[in-house]
């Protein structure tokens, strides 16, 4: 059964559909593609699996072209973004274009940013194929590319027309990528929904075995939370910042270790543990909460410690460039309970050094 969730943003509201075989559902896509010139953006891993299926589904609506990019976070940059613009310009695509992001978070972020920029804005559709992109990056309109000095530093808020989440894609997802997606799933439980966190603790094996009912529930709950948060705070002026739990530490790990060497979800898992340990050191939570967080990440085969090669200086140089920094102060999202988090701007660097060095 297909689930539908609405992201309520007034005239820019859009639906999220979650279910099986949705990539073959031309009826759902028809209103967004009729009389449009379609460019599918995908990568070398996803294209052999799903590109022809999507092309066949969309062929009756209009001209369909594709651009296939290399796979990996290290290619989420201005050079490869330009490949999308070149494909559009070479084919003389105009404002009647629609870009379709067929892939994980990298493809979604780059396609959305290209859509935001091309001729000052054309429509785009998200068809996320990884767990991480299904539960997080495809929803909410954050689009960006990386810079050598920082992750997601060049981008825009730009909402899709629709998000199509076909859970059958997860059957071809490598185990490491699935685990990385679970890091974001767990994050929602920590920062927003204690009951969901407990449900995850009780359903580890069902999720790891790709049980359809468990997957649909987990993805739907994450999308419900994300839609609720984005509807309240689209441009991250308030409550949306809570979705960055673990990301300040995590982005530092990704940047320092080289994009693609640590998957985003792996870095978020280790970063969230560091955030929990920081919260404990400040007296916000006790050791039992840290232990539950560590145990759940560990159950999904995720890292719970930072790279051994990273010391305090390695972290802090990246954390000072974080997008949440205001007035020169590092702002951290820290858990205050299972199911609750808050933003803290008075975290001393001495506290951070103690946590990082003792982790």
Curated annotation (Swiss-Prot):
Cofactor details (free text): Binds 1 divalent metal cation per subunit. Can use either Co(2+) or Zn(2+).
Binding site for NAD(+): 71-76, 105-109, 129-130, 142, 151, 169-172
Compartments, as annotated in UniProt: Cytoplasm
GO BP term, example: aromatic amino acid family biosynthetic process
Catalysed reactions, as listed in the record: 7-phospho-2-dehydro-3-deoxy-D-arabino-heptonate = 3-dehydroquinate + phosphate
An example Gene Ontology molecular-function term: nucleotide binding
Protein name, per record: 3-dehydroquinate synthase
Organism from which the protein derives: Shewanella sp. (strain MR-7)
Highest classification ranks of the organism: Bacteria, Pseudomonadati, Pseudomonadota, Gammaproteobacteria, Alteromonadales
């Amino acid at each position: 059964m297909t689930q539908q969730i609405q992201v309520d943003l007034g005239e820019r509201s859009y639906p999220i559909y979650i279910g099986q075989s949705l990539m073959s559902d031309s009826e759902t896509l028809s209103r967004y593609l009729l009389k449009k010139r379609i460019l599918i953006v995908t990568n070398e891993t996803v294209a052999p699996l799903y590109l022809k299926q999507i092309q066949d589904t969309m062929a009756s609506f209009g001209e369909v072209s594709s651009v296939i990019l290399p796979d990996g976070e290290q290619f989420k940059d201005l050079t490869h973004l330009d490949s999308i613009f070149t494909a559009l310009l070479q084919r003389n695509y105009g404002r009647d274009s629609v870009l379709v992001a067929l892939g994980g978070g990298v493809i979604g972020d780059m396609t959305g940013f290209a859509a935001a920029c091309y001729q000052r804005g054309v429509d785009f559709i998200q068809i996320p194929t990884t767990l991480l992109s299904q539960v997080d990056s495809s929803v909410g309109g954050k689009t960006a590319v990386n810079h050598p000095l920082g992750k997601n530093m060049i981008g825009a808020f730009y909402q899709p027309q629709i998000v199509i989440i076909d859970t059958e894609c997860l059957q071809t997802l490598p185990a490491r990528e699935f685990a990385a997606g679970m890091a974001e799933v767990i994050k929602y439980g920590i920062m927003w929904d204690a009951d969901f966190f407990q449900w995850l603790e009780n359903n580890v094996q069902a999720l790891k075995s790709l049980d359809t009912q468990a997957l649909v529930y987990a993805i739907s709950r994450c999308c419900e939370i994300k839609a609720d948060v984005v509807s309240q705070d689209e441009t991250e002026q308030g409550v949306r910042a809570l979705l960055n739990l673990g990301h300040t530490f995590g982005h530092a790990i990704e940047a320092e270790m080289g994009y693609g060497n640590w998957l985003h979800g792996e870095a978020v898992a280790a970063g969230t543990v560091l955030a929990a340990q920081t919260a404990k050191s400040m007296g916000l939570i006790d050791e039992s909460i840290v232990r539950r967080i560590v145990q759940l990440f560990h159950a999904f085969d995720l890292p719970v410690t930072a790279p051994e090669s990273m010391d305090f200086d390695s972290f802090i140089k990246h954390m000072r460039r974080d997008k949440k920094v205001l007035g020169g102060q590092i702002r951290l999202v820290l858990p205050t309970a299972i199911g609750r988090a808050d933003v803290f701007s008075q975290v001393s660097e001495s506290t951070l050094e103690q946590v990082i060095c003792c982790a």
